[in-house]
Design a protein with these regions (language model features):
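C-terminus-biased signal that marks the final domain/tail of proteins
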Residues: 1-131
Length: 131
């Protein structure tokens, strides 16, 4: 599965294989009444809202940050699938853990990328001015 948070256009897609037994922690944290730096939903929503300061230029920054990330996920998925099939034959528990670890690593990369993107958007587009 490819999972997104908030806005499908601005959200990165997180690869989650059938067989994961836990959701990455940053995707489990969300309280609409309380911002959290540890929440993927808040990180993505923050970027989504900042894009409205300068949509035409900001969406270029979004694409420059998100596309390489998702392209890498697509490439890695093939290798993860191969590793999973091999492990599943020998040790199903380790195979499941591989999927959990991969999902967590992808989620962590998304958080890092979107935190950096948030900082870029704040810096570049404060008061609707490109800096």
């Amino acid at each position: 599965y490819w999972v997104f948070q908030d806005n499908a256009y601005t959200s990165p897609y997180l690869p989650l294989f059938t067989g994961v037994s836990r959701i990455p922690e940053v995707y489990s944290i969300y309280d609409p009444q309380q911002y959290s730096d540890n929440s993927a939903r808040w990180a993505i929503d923050f970027v989504d809202n900042l894009l409205y300061l300068n949509w035409q230029d900001g969406k270029k920054d979004l694409e420059a940050a998100r596309k390489p990330l998702e392209d890498d996920f697509f490439k890695q998925n093939t290798e993860i699938e191969k590793q999973y099939l091999e492990l599943q034959k020998k040790n199903p528990k380790k195979a499941r853990e591989l999927l959990n670890t991969y999902a967590q690593e992808c989620a962590d990369r998304i958080m890092h990328t979107y935190t950096q993107l948030r900082n870029t958007l704040i810096t570049k587009y404060t008061n609707n001015k490109m800096r």
